[in-house]
């Protein structure tokens, strides 16, 4: 797939899909629920543990401990507040009147946010603009339950809004009611939530990419709609005493639906945009998007347009440019030195370094 050998990749992905070993969970959130580790949607995950067989924080999920909110009023939750979702990502979860993503126009509509507003100041979240319900399982934002830790207070939990905006990540946060079982020493950031490297949802979206490239657009639509149907039918973030679960009112105007138009006859450019946008929404903050941009060969174009949009809020991006040579890291000089055969290196440095 990363070599753009779509026909060959399709054969392998079809084997996974028809194996019967995996399925989509009913609820999107359960993929990020420690109680659902190693569920039927997990294809490959990094295993972690606490409180068993002598496992302490050293065997816990350490990859996201710095990304927990900078929440001084919640010492069991608080972290360094890194890995903040961008304005652009949040805007991407807005949908049209049919519950479909606004792929080409989402950036023209700024979703209401509390940038530069103190937590002590009055502010209400947007309850009118329709948004994909996955937004509030992915992003922590003011006025919306931060799982069962209470309503997100806004700026008081943000390390530095000027540097990265008003949002926290939410995908890798355990529930407060899981502290005793799934956290080390009641410290949420040292937890036993496995990190999913590949989910079945991603397999389906990879397969959709392949179907587009080999000329089966309706099959691609089927796979994308499986993901969107789960988002529609699954749980939404709720307000009330049982938040984020229960039967309380929805925390936003959630709306999402499947594609009902025919994909046959649409250009490959349109089809690629639809599949790729779904991958962005479904897999946000799971560590794939940059590498997807690179393998789609659109990193330079996308990221420079992103910089233009995001710098409206984040001033340090002024003057920033993404160079195509930065798609790949430099090869360490020591490895180049070790590669010499008959006086000549078998490894050469990547361009731009």
Describe each model-derived feature in a short phrase.
Residues 62-94, 158-165:
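Short, cationic low-complexity segments
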Residues 1-62, 66, 98-353:
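Acidic/polar-rich alpha-helix caps and helix-coil junctions
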């Amino acid at each position: 797939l990363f070599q753009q050998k779509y026909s060959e990749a399709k054969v392998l992905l079809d084997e996974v899909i028809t194996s019967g070993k995996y399925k989509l969970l009913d609820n999107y959130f359960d993929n990020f629920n420690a109680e659902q580790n190693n569920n039927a949607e997990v294809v490959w995950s990094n295993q972690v543990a606490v409180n068993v067989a002598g496992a302490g924080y050293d065997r816990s999920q350490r990859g996201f401990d710095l990304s927990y909110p900078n929440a001084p009023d919640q010492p069991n939750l608080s972290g360094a507040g890194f890995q903040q979702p961008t304005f652009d990502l949040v805007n991407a979860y807005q949908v049209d009147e049919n519950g479909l993503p606004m792929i080409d126009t989402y950036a023209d509509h700024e979703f209401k946010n509390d940038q530069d507003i103190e937590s002590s100041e009055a502010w209400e979240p947007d309850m009118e603009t329709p948004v994909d319900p996955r937004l509030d399982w992915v992003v922590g934002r003011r006025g919306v339950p931060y799982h069962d830790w209470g309503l997100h207070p806004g700026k008081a939990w943000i390390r530095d809004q000027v540097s990265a905006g008003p949002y926290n990540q939410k995908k890798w946060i355990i529930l407060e009611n899981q502290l005793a079982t799934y956290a080390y020493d009641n410290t949420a950031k040292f937890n036993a939530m496995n990190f999913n490297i590949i989910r079945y949802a991603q397999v389906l979206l990879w397969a959709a990419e392949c179907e587009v490239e080999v000329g089966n657009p309706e099959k691609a639509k089927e796979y994308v709609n499986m993901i969107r149907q789960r988002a529609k039918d699954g749980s939404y973030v709720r307000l009330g005493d049982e938040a984020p679960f229960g039967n309380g009112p929805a925390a936003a105007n959630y709306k999402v639906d499947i594609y009902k138009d025919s994909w046959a006859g649409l250009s490959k450019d349109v089809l690629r945009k639809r599949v790729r946008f779904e991958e962005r929404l479904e897999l946000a903050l799971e560590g794939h998007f940059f590498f997807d941009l690179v393998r789609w060969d659109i990193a330079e174009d996308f990221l420079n347009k992103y910089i233009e949009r995001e710098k409206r809020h984040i001033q340090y991006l002024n003057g920033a440019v993404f160079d195509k040579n930065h798609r790949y890291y430099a090869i360490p000089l020591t490895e180049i030195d070790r590669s010499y055969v008959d006086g000549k290196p078998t490894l050469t440095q990547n361009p731009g370094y």
